[in-house]
Regions:
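Phosphopantetheine-dependent thiolation modules in NRPS/PKS and related acyl-activating systems
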Residues: 1-34, 38-44, 49-75
Length: 75
């Protein structure tokens, strides 16, 4: 899985935040737009695009795009 593709797919789950604002260091929970709906959309995206099922509790342990990316790569 390529980091730039992951950032693009991750950013697509946000309506108001431009993809250019996302990096692997982005603390996504601190974004003004962050909500539980984004979390569900991200979990769904990971399932569909990467064929990996993450539980909400697993995602709760991550704060940055990099941490989420690393968690997915462990699966």
């Amino acid at each position: 899985m390529e980091t730039q593709d992951f950032i693009k797919n991750f950013a697509a789950q946000f309506d108001d935040t431009d993809v250019s604002e996302f990096t692997m260091e982005t603390r996504f929970r601190e974004l003004d737009e962050w909500s539980s709906l984004n979390a569900l959309a991200i979990l769904n995206m990971i399932s569909k695009k990467y064929n990996i099922v993450l539980k909400a509790d697993e995602m709760k342990t991550t704060n940055t795009v990099q941490e989420l990316f690393d968690l997915i790569n462990l699966k």
